[in-house]
Amino acid sequence: MMRRNSGTRPFGARVAWRTVMAAVVAMMAVMTLVVGQGLAGAEPAPAPAPASPAAPAPASPAPASPAAPPSSAAPAAAPAPVPPGKVTNTYWYTDRRVALWVYSPSMNTNIQVQILLARDWHAKPKEKFPQLTMLDGLRAQDDQSGWVLNTKIVDFYKDKNVNVILPIGGESSFYTDWKEPDRGKNYKWETFLMRELPPILENDWRSTDVRGIEGLSMGGSAAMMLAARNPGFYKFAASFSGILQFSSFGMPQAIQFAVRDGGGYDSMKMFGPPSDPAWKEHDPYVLADKLQGTSLYISSGNGMVGAHDKPSDIPLLATNYSGVGLEMLSRVTSQQFAVQLNRKGIPGQAVYRPSGTHTWPYWEFEMMQAWPQAAAALGLSRDAVACRVDGAFRKLWDANKGDLGGCLTPSYGVPGGKAQDFANGRIFTGPKGPKIVTGAIGGAYVAAGGPGGRLGKPLSNEEPTRDGKGRVNYFEHGRITWTAKDGTKVLK
């Protein structure tokens, strides 16, 4: 059965707020009615006017209080053969973060996918690792993951033995296959994530078929939807502030408003008119029975002012007005979804926070809170860092430990010597003793083949360039420079 946070109380509209917040009060009143009377199936209520979130928080749809839709939907059609994706470009941000540009035949465009590599990626080059996909919100950018821009995801996963997969882009897409192109984009995200990308991750980037998926807001909705539409594909699925009902009363109209506000898209081109069966065929609530056997984590705040919100002059209300309404909507649909899982005897973890709006600090917290459950589902519950600084590297590490951080791996063999990985870089043996390679230069060194590549072993630590405008590492057969203007360059 679902496990719940026992310290949470239902939210309501009992505070007499000001006239300017009448819409929010009405929304809360409707939701209180749903929570009090309708967790097993609420009567439909008219949809209040949704609000859009302030940047940079990604927005979720702002639905009306949902009524319980039918408990089943037609299964997804058997997939037709799909040509595999193809990597057209690769860029190493660091020695542990790499960006791939993958040509998607179904979308006829390149999709950027970043990977945060597993802790032992370099130390154990013959091993494969589980994978965890992290989906973005409604306002997903085309150049960078919101997780990277707004959270400490890169640091959090450094010591974990999982390949973290970050698809870039997909604004307002719900990571699904749209019926028609819109705004110059032919969204086929489900095809990409389920069929075009996996062979690349598993054949070329040492990922196993043990997979998890998490998302915030729109990405949380998509995580549950994709897991339900593809039973068994994911071992773990998590929704942080997701909207987990698509086809209930008023929901298609609310989603239409959200995707228009989130980028000028038309949800009719996604699933068709509200009467189209596609709405139910993608509804996590309707598809809940398909999640049997998947480890589930569902969380939301309640829209009340929390630790990461700025209080307004209205009691209990944050200044992030749109984030208030969106999080309340997430709360209600998440509770309805949890009740549906209970009805079907599907276990999971439902966490209802006593405060918090629809914004990034809360999603970063949930990412960290969900990890133990994700680790267990991915077979990593007993995984932990087990290393000491190698004696040959101790003196250099002692002098630089503030920058390098703690060790992640024991030392291991590389062509012509050995290396050891730390939180913020690596130490290699070399002709002039152990040397540090880190940051963007460390990424370029991996791209150049590392100690066994064309540059050979390092001859220096990273140091200022002669003109003082950048940084440089010297190697046996060349050097790598970095400047803020030009990035990294490999030179002879």
What are the language-model segments listed below?
Residues G7-R9:
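Juxtamembrane low-complexity tails/linkers enriched in Ser/Thr-Pro and polybasic
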Residues M2-N5, W17-A384:
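Non-catalytic cap/lid and distal C-terminal segments of serine-dependent acyl enzymes
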Residues G12, L116, S173, G184, ...:
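Alpha-helical structural elements
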Residues W92, R382-K492:
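Extended, compositionally biased repeat/scaffold regions that form elongated interaction surfaces
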Residues F11-W17:
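Short, low-complexity patches enriched in S/T/P/G
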